[in-house]
From Swiss-Prot:
Its EC number is 3.4.-.-. One of its GO terms (molecular function) is metalloexopeptidase activity. Belongs to the peptidase M28 family. This is Vacuolar membrane protease. SUPFAM superfamilies: Zn-dependent exopeptidases. It comes from Saccharomyces cerevisiae (strain AWRI1631) (Baker's yeast).
Length: 976
């Protein structure tokens, strides 16, 4: 009996037990979180256990060190060195293999001219034409069964001008080399193509060029390796459909990492980046986009270097891609299910996949069946008189306390916006923690205040039922979203899991009521509200000498019945579950209770029905209901809390640094934090009113710490810097001033930093800072002149870009007024690889340009030839982007054809000034090398000293990236 008493004391529903269980639950969630984020670092292959994998990793790490020795954007000479190194490594690996072939676009002088939607801005209506000279390196491994659809493995080897490209995309490139080395030794069944492509950063151009190669017809599937962050684990960022997600599930058995929440966020454009996977997907390929995704404030900066990453990160991407490619290369694939997939991993141990369409069907079943079952059980309990109606005050406590918590949260978010809107960039834990504790603390205070004045015994069960109703409404809304998005809202699955588990908990309570003992007379009220018509003077005695009242199992379902103190502490009144009787262990009904309670039946035979129930049946009910609160807790709290916490962490981990990219992103992150914290709080709210004073004191303390950290701590540090975008602009049409543009978030960050630069501080240079769109600030000042060329005389910036008009028949008398106008331009640009031409007419709303021609010089042996590429567009062409490989070829030869105004609007008005058909052409040319020197008059000087000054003198809480495809932009303009 003593052991039984101890056992019952440990498991009964009281404050200490609940608080301890909450502590255990959140401790386990924390340990799982740490395990998930640290485990991959311990799984490096050992030479004695996995010599082949160890060799692949060590070789890849060495390749990465060489590739990332310097900045190597497409616009730099270092880009050619990386290309040549990769070509050498590819030839070394393939050797004399009989089934391997190598194709070098640079050697074959492959180029394309095509019309391109802005890949980084799908909403853009700007019509763009792109000319690109490729230096992709392709390798074909012919499979044993070449008739099977092939697999493409792709990564880009260019970096941005301001980053070494260790994770973007050096790790992807060396992982491809490792995959190539592995598959050379283990010949695949299906054909594999490896695409080491160039110039992903400024238009996804290497991937676009792939489809100009004959080998592109051999591949149906693609594994794209990318870096949109700067380290950590490589995530399955997105995948084509349920079939490809299941292939990942079947292949990546060690350390799988993926979540369809990333996929939904990426497609919803919460992340302003793109990868080559977009191009492959648009061209009908199916596959997997595996990428590094954090931290974004180091992405595209000088800290994207080998110093800020690790072998563990490299091995995670390499091993993931190797498992996936080996499986796809050697197995027949079931690809029938092409609906979008919902997927997630459990701490890197297990990967789960379900079709989003299937999830929608299950949601519909849940939405239809659960209320039917709940209402049915409610009607049964009403019929059996085991359900007691509750006052409106009892029913409104939980939703009103939740609403109050949301209001408090909203007020606090206003304080964040006013005082520290970028706090998420430094550490999203503190604002999320503040939001979370606000909701649960507000709920605790309001519910307990209500219970003090108007006690409610079964608050927990009422809250669980109301939680079920709230989640049913949420699931209805999210299911509608899922359906209307053609099942592409793949990040909503946590709500389905939460709803299912909370529904089971609510149904269990209703089932217990429905199966409860029938009574003819209710002897008490479950909720003794202030508005009761009468009050009960009977006192319930739930336990005497360890014996339980067998006539009230439903009371034990919801609260402790072990001693009088517990009853008073919990505000217990047993009529919620059915009849309430005071039972003496020897004499049944207490005589004094019968004498003083006028509600006691006058006829002794009135309880014959209850007495007729078998002792075995009552014992079984008692055994089931005694610990039901624990079952409810285990259903509602641990699993939903872990899934929701992990989901919120996934979202914030990927998006918290996007607050630096504009006010819209800031409000998005703030909104996600608020909604996420509410969802994290929902599982514990039905129980939290019951916690002990230590728990609620710790909650209040955590809120105070979190709020102070959120509102008062500076958002940027050395490890979490503010990313600022740099460019130096020289507009030749307005002089030779080298105007430095520094773009970053508003908030008095940029100007104080710039004012401390020596060139500004000691020369009284004026800094002009203005607000631009989306909460960004642009600061401009005249900086030091760049030294882009080596020269023996004075550097003349105006000689960097010269425009020659070779032909223009706009004013020719031989041209009919209805005939398109034709002009030819020769751009003389020194040591350059990228220029952009923008076309505009002052007299026409849309660009009148309908045709572009690029005259290309071919240097292939045996003799040079001229190639003409032409593209036409009926809707008009706004922009021509030019990318060439040869630094020594100093000219771009362009042909432009545009319609006169007469053809576009039919207006026959006189043009006395002869200007209505003029075409304005703006030219911008880009240089991206800054970490190198030029020799001017025999002296070595830095190419872009203005950028060097920022790097050297700005506080460590700033990091810098390029604003455009080059760090220096020289502009000019002409009128044709």
């Amino acid at each position: 009996m003593k052991l039984k008493s101890v056992f019952r004391s440990v498991l009964k529903y009281r404050k200490t037990n609940l608080s301890l269980l909450l502590l255990i639950t959140y401790s386990i969630i924390t340990l799982l979180y740490i395990f998930d984020h640290e485990r991959y670092k311990l799984n490096l292959p050992k030479e004695d256990e996995h010599p082949e994998f160890n060799d692949l990793l060590e070789t890849a790490w060495g390749d990465l060190q060489i590739i990332t020795a310097s900045f190597h954007p497409y616009t730099s000479k270092e880009n050619d060195k990386v290309h040549d190194y990769l070509l050498k490594r590819v030839l070394e690996i393939t050797g004399n293999s009989s089934f391997a072939s190598v194709s070098d676009d640079k050697e074959s002088e492959r180029s394309i001219l095509f019309q391109q939607q802005d890949p980084f801005n799908e909403s853009s209506r700007f019509s763009r034409v792109t000319y690109f000279e490729s230096s992709n390196i392709l390798v074909k491994l012919e499979g044993k069964n070449p008739e099977e659809e092939g697999l493409l493995l792709s990564a880009h080897f260019d970096s941005v001008p301001t980053g070494y490209g260790a994770t973007d995309d050096g790790m992807g490139v060396v992982s491809l080399l490792a995959n190539l080395k592995y598959h050379i030794k283990h010949r695949p069944n299906r054909t594999l193509i490896f695409n080491f492509n160039n110039n992903e950063e400024f238009g996804l151009l290497g991937a676009s060029t792939y489809f100009n190669h004959s080998w592109s017809n051999l591949t149906k599937y693609v594994i794209n390796l990318e870096g949109t962050g700067a380290g950590g684990k490589a995530v399955l960022f997105r995948t084509s459909d349920t079939s490809t997600a299941k292939i990942y599930q079947q292949s990546v058995k060690e350390n799988p990492f993926g979540n369809s929440i990333y996929q939904q966020g990426f497609y919803s454009r919460y992340v302003r980046s793109e990868t080559d996977y977009k191009i492959y997907e648009e061209n009908g390929m199916r596959g997997w986009d595996v990428a590094f995704y954090k931290p974004r404030n180091l992405y595209h900066t000088i800290k994207d270097s080998i110093q800020y990453t690790s072998k563990a990160s490299l091995w995670h991407m390499l091993h993931t891609s190797l498992q996936l490619s080996a499986y796809v290369a050697s197995n027949s694939l079931d690809t029938a299910d092409q609906t979008p997939a919902c997927y997630f991993d459990f701490i890197g141990l297990k990967f789960f996949v379900i079709s989003a369409k299937t999830l929608f069907y299950w949601n519909c079943i849940f939405l239809l069946v659960s209320p039917v079952v709940a209402i049915g059980l409610y009607l049964i309990s009403r019929d059996r008189m085991t359900w007691k109606s509750h006052s409106w005050l009892s029913w409104t406590r939980f939703p009103l306390s939740l609403a109050a918590g949301i209001i408090v949260q909203k007020l606090f978010s206003n304080d964040i916006i006013r005082s520290n809107p970028l706090t998420f960039s430094r550490n999203y834990f503190w604002p999320i923690s503040a939001f979370f504790t606000q909701v649960i603390f507000t709920s605790y205070v309001l519910i307990n205040c209500s219970n003090f004045f108007f006690p409610c015994a079964d608050m927990k069960s009422l809250s669980i039922i109301e939680l079920f109703i709230i989640l049913w409404t949420i699931l209805l809304f999210t299911s509608k979203l899922l359906y209307s998005s053609d099942y592409r809202y793949t990040g909503l699955y946590p709500l389905s899991i939460f709803f299912l588990l909370s529904t089971i908990a609510a149904i269990l309570r209703l089932l217990a009521l429905a199966l409860g003992m029938r009574t003819r007379k209710r002897l008490g009220r479950e909720c003794r509200d202030h508005h009761s018509n009468y009050s009960s003077h009977s006192q319930i005695d739930m336990e005497r000498d360890g014996q339980e009242n067998l006539e009230q199992p439903q009371d034990q379902f919801t609260s402790s019945q072990d001693d009088q103190a517990s009853i008073q502490d919990d505000n217990v009144s047993t009529t919620s579950a059915g009849p309430s009787h005071n039972v003496d262990e020897d004499h049944g009904m207490d005589s004094s209770s019968q004498q003083h309670d006028e509600r006691v039946p006058l006829l002794k035979g009135s309880n014959s029905m209850e007495e007729g129930l078998s002792t075995r049946e009552n014992s079984l009910k008692l055994e089931y209901t005694d610990y039901a609160w624990i079952i409810q807790f285990l259903l509602i709290v641990p699993i939903p809390s872990f899934i929701l916490f992990n989901s919120v962490d996934v979202i914030m981990d990927a998006l918290n640094h996007t607050v630096q990219e504009g006010s819209k992103a800031t409000f998005d992150v703030l909104r996600f934090g608020m909604v996420g914290s509410i969802l994290m709080a929902l599982p514990i709210l039905p129980f939290f009113y019951k916690v002990n004073y230590i728990t609620i004191s710790l909650t209040a303390l955590l809120f105070l710490i979190s709020a102070s950290k959120t509102l008062l701590v500076h958002p940027f540090t050395n490890s979490n810097p503010l990313k600022v975008r740099f460019s130096q602009n020289i507009d030749l049409s307005q002089g030779n001033a080298a105007s430095v543009h520094v773009l970053g978030r508003e908030g008095n960050f940029l100007k104080p930093m710039l004012q401390d630069l020596p060139s500004i501080k000691y020369s009284s240079t004026h800094i002009n800072c203005t607000s631009v769109t989306n909460g960004m600030e642009l600061c401009m000042y005249d900086g030091m002149q760049p030294n882009l060329l080596s020269t023996n005389g004075n550097t003349n910036i105006s000689s960097m870009v010269k425009v020659h008009v070779l032909h223009n028949n706009r004013n020719s008398t031989e041209r009919s007024p209805y005939e398109p106008i034709v002009a030819e331009l020769l751009l003389d640009v020194k040591e350059n690889r990228a220029c952009t031409l923008t076309f505009e007419s002052r007299h026409q709303a849309k660009s009148p340009v309908r045709e572009i021609t690029v005259y290309q010089k071919k240097n292939s042996a045996p003799q040079k030839t001229n190639i003409t590429k032409t593209i036409k567009s009926a809707s008009g062409i706004n922009e021509l982007q030019l990318h060439k490989l040869d630094f020594d070829q100093e000219t771009y030869h362009i042909g432009v054809q545009w319609f006169p105004k007469l053809l576009t609007d039919g207006n026959l008005e006189d043009d006395k000034l002869g200007t209505k058909d003029e075409l304005s052409v703006s030219i911008s040319c880009y240089w991206g090398e800054y970490d190198s020197e030029s020799v001017v008059n025999g002296t070595a000087v830095r190419k872009i000293p203005a950028f060097d000054e920022l790097i050297n003198y700005a506080p460590l809480s700033f990091s810098f990236t390029n604003e455009q495809k080059g760090l220096v932009i020289v502009k000019d303009a002409i009128i044709l």
